[in-house]
Regions:
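Catalytic center-proximal scaffold of phosphoryl-transfer enzymes
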Residues: 1-269
Length: 269
């Protein structure tokens, strides 16, 4: 049997419509999770810039949810999160600041920026020493967590101690205009209470890798295709990504999952 490109596009769009209840259920599961990770990346729809937002949750029934929006504003993140009130893992993009709940910022991003700072100022012992001192905070936290399980009270005490040390490192340079360490020092102060939640909460990741991995296929397809041509195309692309990435994360057979959806006739669109 031969299928034209148009026929394939129509089938995929109908499949996306047919699975709307499944995707709504996945979003509800994500919002009910105690932990969620978010990230965003650029996407073009009909030549216009927009963003794909990725929402990922851990646990035995993980969720991977993709959403396209023309905007990269923080309101998109809060709308997508809905009534979520758990710990949100993200990078340091200001759009996530609108979330009023508990936050864990990504240490992978901070460590990369510290490494760049050291490389750019390798001959400045003060800069290198400061960056290494911030890195030691992370290493100390991980070393403590790699040992025997800590009681909740001890985890809280450790987190407070690390936050206090981060504050002292931050205030050292935050007021010195033009100093190489100033930007990251201000970041430490701005997010002082969002750097060591992973110490307080067992199982909470210190990085945002789950959301970043979710968006990697989006980045690859963007480079190959340039994006989508219409709103229908974007909706279909996000629907397929949500389902297939969730099935993959749960170790499910995508072919069997598709068959269960296609057991009933696809709707006309």
């Amino acid at each position: 049997m031969r299928l034209s490109t148009g026929a394939l596009a129509d089938l995929l769009e109908r499949f996306g419509h047919a699975t709307a209840p499944e995707r709504a259920a996945l979003l509800a599961q994500a919002r009910a999770s105690p932990v969620a990770h978010m990230d965003e990346t650029g996407w073009r729809e009909n030549g216009q810039n927009g963003s794909v937002w990725g929402l990922a949750t851990p646990g035995p029934q993980p969720v991977r949810y993709d959403h396209y929006d023309r905007s990269r504003a923080g309101s998109v993140a809060t709308d997508l999160l809905g009534d979520f009130d758990g710990h949100l893992g993200s990078d340091f993009y200001g759009g996530y600041n609108r979330y009023a709940g508990q936050h864990q910022r990504c240490w992978a991003h901070l460590l990369r920026d510290l490494h760049t700072l050291k490389e750019d100022h390798a001959t400045d012992a003060g800069v290198v020493g400061w960056a290494q001192a911030v890195r030691v905070l992370y290493d100390d936290a991980q070393a403590a967590l790699d040992g025997p399980p800590l009681p909740a009270a001890l985890r809280t005490t450790l987190a407070r101690q690390l936050e206090a040390q981060a504050f002292r490192l931050g205030v050292r340079y935050t007021g010195l205009k033009g100093h190489p360490c100033r930007a990251l020092a201000r970041r430490l102060l701005r997010h002082q209470g969002e750097l060591f939640e992973f110490v307080r909460v067992p199982g909470l990741s210190a990085d945002n890798n789950a959301a970043e991995r979710l968006l990697r296929p989006v980045v690859v397809q963007r480079k190959i295709s340039g994006g989508t041509r219409s709103a229908h195309g974007s909706t279909t692309r996000m629907a397929l990504a949500t389902l297939f990435e969730t099935w993959r994360a749960r170790g499910l057979n995508a072919f069997h999952e598709c068959l269960s959806v296609l057991h009933f006739p696809l709707p006309q669109v």
